[in-house]
Regions:
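Conserved helicase motor core of P-loop NTPases
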Residues: 1-123, 128-139
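Conserved helicase C-terminal RecA-like lobe
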Residues: 104-181
Length: 181
């Protein structure tokens, strides 16, 4: 697969054959493909897999994040009784997946519990919202090491986005079970 991705990157279209044989290439209209992408991602989350959706533009990311969040809310996987505005203009509630967009090495940016207590909040980390506080701060649990941290209202407003979908560049460095594009 590694050799194949290098061949594909260099323009060798025969490299697509491996992906097609494995059932990783799908055709359809853009709307159909996005619908399947969202459904497959939701199935990943329901199965407990760390999954991310990658898109080439921020507009596609915004659209995919909205679609995924809407389905999760309709299935009660993300709550709407108390929500908070994020830096990407989305609203997040308990159960939503968010991504932090700035490092926070201050005392308030250190995690508690999990397998890496004391880790700082990093740009690109993926979290699940566990509590929305009255002061508009969020308590979040790290997707991988399970540590929790309370993000200040200002940090949430300026540096936190929905984290179901990301641009390819923004997702660099993430380790997941499933990547959907």
């Amino acid at each position: 697969q590694a050799k194949n991705s290098i061949a594909l990157r260099s323009g060798d279209l025969a490299a697509i054959d491996l992906y097609a044989r494995r059932g990783w290439v799908h055709d359809g209209t853009l709307a159909e493909l996005k619908t399947h992408l969202v459904a497959d991602h939701i199935a990943d989350l329901e199965a407990g897999r760390n999954s991310i959706v990658l898109a080439s533009t921020t507009n596609d990311v915004r659209e995919l994040n909205s679609a995924i969040q809407s389905i999760r809310r309709s299935e009660n996987a993300a709550r709407t009784d108390r929500v908070i505005g994020l830096s990407d203009q989305h609203m997040a509630g308990v159960g939503d997946q968010v991504v932090t967009r700035s490092n926070d090495r201050g005392p308030g940016g250190r995690t508690k519990g999990g397998t890496r207590p004391g880790s700082y909040v990093r740009n690109g980390d993926v979290w699940t919202v566990v509590k929305v506080h009255r002061d508009k701060s969020l308590t979040v649990r790290h997707r991988d090491h399970k540590g929790t941290v309370r993000l200040s209202a200002q940090y949430v407003r300026e540096h936190t986005e929905l984290g179901y979908a990301m641009t390819i560049h923004r997702a660099q460095g993430l380790t997941v079970d499933v990547t959907r594009m």
